[in-house]
């Protein structure tokens, strides 16, 4: 983890990785053809561990896929299992998330062909009556929304220009074989609803099969960035209420004026977003203290324990490049259930 011999590396903690305050840059170097002809997870991890720090550890919030690639590698090291196997056994299966999984090309079964590290349906390939345990059936491809045409490295990528469907869009995760701590999961609204409700039930100490203790979820869903204090959440909500009161048109799609509510005060739980520049999917009515996460392809999940509510938006907004961004759409959707609940304004 310290190939650059940077003494600051010794100050990086798991808390910093989980709150995106480690000082790592956002994305891996994609230089060279690694992982294009065939997946190379080891090279992705090597690059993640050797990436120079862009900021001092603990100094600023900077969303980093690299940090979560490292966390995924740590999970595999500690458990001795591939990440997709571990998560399937400990999260997806117990919550009955039958339509949720990683789709690594190496474990595809059925009528398909592999092009580099991408999957494509092939009607002329032999049919498979029953897929072995540990694989996934390419019959799923018909149910998966396409994301975008593969734009990764013209001339070196055999899949370049082809439509990605059932292959993770994130190029780093794709080069690593479709399973990384930063990306790779496919799901449905139903399954994400099961996940969110189980999480809410566990937080509220109701019967739940969610695989974490309430005390652990408390760390994930309250501010945990370096230097956090209990007063930050109250101050952020006060600032958001004041901003909303000063907004002439509360239905404006630009929503509240500030994300985060207090400029320079980014609030992150362990993994979850609470109040940062990425929090627009929260909308203008759910309080700061609700939490969620967005995805580049047009996916968001936002959860509000105070009202026992969750909002799921799944869109393939980058299917046509240059289309409208999904973040404003998610932010417009979230206030609708908040208003309907009658708890958070009109």
Residue ranges of predicted features:
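Acyl-group handling in specialized metabolite and lipid biosynthesis
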Residues: 1
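Structured C-terminal helix/loop/strand segments within mature extracytoplasmic catalytic/sensor domains
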Residues: 289-346
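Short, surface-exposed loop or secondary-structure junction motifs
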Residues: 4-288
